[in-house]
């Protein structure tokens, strides 16, 4: 049976879902953050980039933060029709602000549902409780059960984007348009693609990779082999995602 390990630490909370002794989901909750996925907030429109499609909204910053701090801004897509500059819009944050090592990226938001109530996102503990898997609380001063389950290796993989599997490796490369997963290895094309598909599916779920994800597999021999590769990816990703078939060039997109 799958089980959560949960630790409430200083400045961060950690959770790891184990199934059969293997980590299948990792979550890290870091404080503080002005815009977090799931927040429903009233934000002011400061720029209309494409009327009816895209704009930039800003949360009023506290007195000790400059009003131009991009950590308090989000890209709103779609922008509601007839929205004007300086108007207030109720939005839901779908991605926190991130820095990819080159560019600071604003948070992403979408219009909140008509019945949405302003408020902060559910805490990590609340989210994992909603999964109905049992939770084992790990005390910060006791044995580090998360470390024993491979936490440091998971963090290293997330930071480097490099994941090894028998017969090859994955390189996970975030870009402004999508997340790209590149495959390299020494098996024959069909075997490498299938092994990579299983590893990629696990990685997408483990790291919670969302948005548009493109996997570049080696070109496999036939349509049946491509279907096996696509099925292996989706088996690892789990429910809730949609994907294209693997095309003749070995490319698959997951949304």
Predicted regions and their residues:
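DE-rich acidic low-complexity regions and acidic surface loops
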Residues: 1-255
């Amino acid at each position: 049976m799958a089980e959560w390990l949960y630790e409430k630490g200083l400045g961060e909370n950690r959770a790891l879902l184990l199934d059969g002794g293997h980590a299948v989901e990792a979550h890290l909750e870091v404080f503080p953050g002005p815009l977090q996925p799931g927040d429903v907030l009233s934000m002011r429109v400061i720029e209309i980039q494409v009327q009816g499609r895209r704009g930039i909204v800003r949360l009023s910053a506290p007195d000790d933060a400059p009003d131009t701090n991009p950590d308090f801004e989000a890209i709103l897509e779609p922008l509601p029709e007839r929205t004007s500059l300086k108007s207030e819009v109720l939005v839901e944050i779908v991605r926190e602000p991130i820095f990819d090592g080159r560019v600071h990226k604003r948070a992403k938001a979408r219009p909140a549902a008509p019945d949405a109530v302003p408020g902060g996102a559910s805490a990590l503990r609340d989210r994992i409780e909603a999964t109905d898997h049992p939770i084992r609380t790990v005390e910060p001063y006791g044995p580090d059960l998360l470390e024993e389950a491979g936490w440091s290796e998971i963090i290293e993989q997330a930071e480097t984007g490099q994941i090894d599997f028998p017969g090859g490796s994955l390189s996970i490369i975030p870009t402004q348009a999508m997340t790209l997963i590149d495959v390299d290895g020494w098996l024959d094309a069909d075997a490498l693609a299938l092994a990579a598909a299983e590893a990629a599916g696990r990685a997408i779920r483990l790291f919670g990779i969302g948005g548009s994800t493109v996997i570049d597999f080696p070109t496999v021999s036939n349509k049946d082999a491509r279907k096996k590769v696509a099925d292996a990816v989706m088996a690892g990703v789990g429910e809730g995602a949609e994907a294209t078939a693997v095309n003749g060039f070995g490319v698959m997109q997951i949304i």
